[in-house]
Amino acid sequence: MRRDRERRIYKLFVTRNSEYLMRGDVCVGVRDRRSGTWSIDHEAVTQVVATMVHRQGERVRMHSFTPRVGSALYFARGPVLTSSVRAVRRPDRATYDDWRRAIDSLPVAAE
């Protein structure tokens, strides 16, 4: 039951090539949609979303970080601009558990 409650604070932003797992406005993991592999060292991981960007032809409009299909995520540090978001959903249990396994397999840094 605890894992289900914890999962609710996460959102999965799906783009053409990647899935961005967000905890609030912080990216905690990026998964390649083709291979299903989590990239914990992706440029967006640990970054806060600065804004969302919506392209309308030549015009670009920025708006606050609210889940919107059709807009792109913009991470200022890096910078990283994703392709358009195709879907936003709560990660299912398998996705969340797969991400946790990827995190848990990382070597612990020496202090």
Feature annotation, model-predicted:
Residues 36-111:
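Low-complexity intrinsically disordered segments
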Residues 16, 26-28, 34-35:
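An extracellular/secretory-lumen and virion-surface interaction module
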Residues 20-24:
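Broad, structure-driven detector of short, well-ordered beta-strand segments within folded domains
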Residues 10-15:
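A short beta-strand micro-motif
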